[in-house]
Amino acid sequence: MKKYLLIAFSLFTLSSIAQSSKDADLLINKISKRYKKFSSIKADFTYSIESKAEKINEKQKGNIVIKGNKFRLDIAGQTIICDNKTQWTYSKEINEVNVQHYKPKEGIMKLDDIFTMYNKGFVSKMGEVVKEGGRELTILELAPKDKKKNYFKIKLFIEKNNQQIIKTVVFDKNGSIHTYTITNQIPNIKFVDGYFTFVAKKYPNVEINDMR
């Protein structure tokens, strides 16, 4: 499941970084403030992982809904639901759900921080502006201050005219590259809190593994 909490991709050189980190910090703060204003956000995305050493090249489509510290993630036949206390991981193929206490510190990053985590704990640099799909994207490069992290670099692709995060690229220390491209994002949709809990009666004959 952890691989689905990663975000990554891109090919451009480090020599393109020319502007000061102060400019990058200002942009990151703008992005963070923008997303923190939302009461909720729903995003459709494409996730891919590439590892030449392990000969892996996979791509999956998914969607995520975030409301405060709660989230619901659907990808690769799995639904991961969290109400900030309990996490349910449901596998459609075998009609089974694992229930456990939510421990955000065990993952690569907290899902509810995906859009706002970048304004803390990173050294940032401003990169070049590129064009993708007819849009101008500003590239930001971030390195975690905590060298114990599983990744050593993140690249953010930010739409220039509205500060939306379009693509995030995470580079693992083991050589893997994770790509997370947001294809659609809608803020401020109303979701009842019950949307972020697993209701067993909606899944007839589901096998429940309570690991708490």
What is each residue range found by the language model?
Residues Y4-T13:
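Sec-dependent N-terminal signal peptides
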Residues S15-I56, N69-K70, K202, E207-R212:
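N-terminal leader/targeting segments and the immediate start of mature chains
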Residues A18, K125-P204, I208-R212:
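Gly/Pro-enriched, hydrophobic low-complexity segments
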Residues F38-S40, K59-K61, G68, C82, ...:
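Extracytoplasmic
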Residues Y47-I49, S91, V169-D172:
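Beta-turn initiation residues at beta-strand->coil junctions
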Residues K61-M109, H178-T179:
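An acidic-aromatic
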Residues Y102-E136:
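Flexible, surface-exposed loop/linker segments and immediately adjacent secondary-structure boundaries
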